């Protein structure tokens, strides 16, 4: 098993893997592969936190991060991270690969000086990694909503 930074020549394989993993998962079809494609063009994309996982020379996992901000009610801004899509090929899910890839990426983020990650994700998938509901940190959307899927992890 190898974790390395994604390269341009990986993009198509990664997008096909994302499509396979998310197809018809929570709604008909999916758009996560297109989202990953677009994120790579964003000025907030962090190439140093764009990882693939290989097993026997085949890409089986992927995660990418973007810069984000939290705006406090007093106007102060905190620079944070968000990630997604986070994907493990369906044939390799529930075998510990996701945990290894996520932990590797979180350590790399911490090494770069980041201390907070905020994501939209299924709590059943992320609570075991230390992500907690946003309400615990008084982090909400602009309209004071605290969605269950808005989750926070402090990097310690």
Locate the predicted segments by residue.
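Short acidic (Asp/Glu) patches
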Residues: 66, 101, 105, 133-137
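Active-site rim helix/loop that mediates acceptor-substrate recognition in acyltransferases
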Residues: 15, 22, 26-64, 69-70
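A short, internal acetyl-CoA/4′-phosphopantetheine-binding micro-motif in the GNAT/acyltransferase core
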Residues: 85-93
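Conserved acetyl-CoA pyrophosphate-binding loop and the N-cap/start of the following alpha-helix
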Residues: 92, 96-104, 114
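Conserved active-site alpha-helix within GNAT-family acetyltransferase domains
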Residues: 111-115, 120-145
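A short beta-loop-alpha structural element at the N-terminal edge
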Residues: 2-16
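A short, polar/charged loop-to-alpha-helix boundary motif
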Residues: 69-78
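C-terminal "cap" of GNAT-fold acetyltransferases
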Residues: 140-156
């Amino acid at each position: 098993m190898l974790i390395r930074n994604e390269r341009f020549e990986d993009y198509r394989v990664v997008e096909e893997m994302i499509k396979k993993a998310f197809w018809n998962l929570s709604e008909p079809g999916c758009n996560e592969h297109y989202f990953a494609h677009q994120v790579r063009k964003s000025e907030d994309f962090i190439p140093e936190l764009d990882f693939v996982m290989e097993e026997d020379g085949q890409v089986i996992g992927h995660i990418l991060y973007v810069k984000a901000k939290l705006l406090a009610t007093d106007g102060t801004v905190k620079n944070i991270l968000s990630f997604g899509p986070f994907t493990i090929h369906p044939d390799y899910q529930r075998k510990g690969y996701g945990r290894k890839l996520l932990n590797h990426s979180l350590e790399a983020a911490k090494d770069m000086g980041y201390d907070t990650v905020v994501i939209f994700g299924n709590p059943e998938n992320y609570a075991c990694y230390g992500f907690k509901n946003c309400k615990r940190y008084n982090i909400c959307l602009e309209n004071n909503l605290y969605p269950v899927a808005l989750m926070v992890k402090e990097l310690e």
